[in-house]
Amino acid sequence: MMKKATGEALAKTAYEAARMPFHGYLPGKDSNLEPIVRPFPKWTLKEADGLWCAAFVYYCCREAGFEIPIRPNECVTCHLAGCVAWEEFAMGDSRIAYHPGEDTRFPKAGDIVLYDRVFCNQPHDHMGIIVQKLKNTLIVAEGNIQNQSGMISRPMDAHIRAYIRIPDGYTYA
């Protein structure tokens, strides 16, 4: 039986996973993303290389005890290794809180943050898990920061598309 999932456990799990660090193929290093890629059977380490921030979030959610399939019915576009799928999932399941990025009062540790136009000029291009909220800044555990996991400080600005809060004890049904 899995432990009861909480936002607090998700923030702690994400912090630990970010500091591991996980990484794709780097000069002189083979990828260690196998635990992150494994749940997605049609995805290889080479295909995931440089494209795994959403899979990192999924890995952290599962490790924290959240029971979520790789492709919930709410996900129309792709499975949860894609950022857009997390938005579809949150907006399609009324138990999950979805708040637009301009709602700066909402985010707290353990929330998922979706970004627009962080690495490329596209919506839904990156995501992570909030570990700490400061006044106008978020401390976020992210996968795929230059193909590595890590902790990063991000301003609460127009790049934030939305915040997602999975309720404590959530199980997909």
Where are these regions (language model features)?
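N-terminal capping segments
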Residues: 1-71
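Short linear sequence elements within intrinsically disordered, low-complexity coil regions
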Residues: 30, 45, 61-64, 94, ...
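Solvent-exposed, flexible loop/coil residues
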Residues: 37-40, 90-93, 149, 156
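...with weaker cross-activation on analogous glycine-rich loops/strands in unrelated enzymes
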Residues: 4, 8, 67-148
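Intrinsic disorder/low-complexity segments
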Residues: 12-15, 82, 86, 159, ...
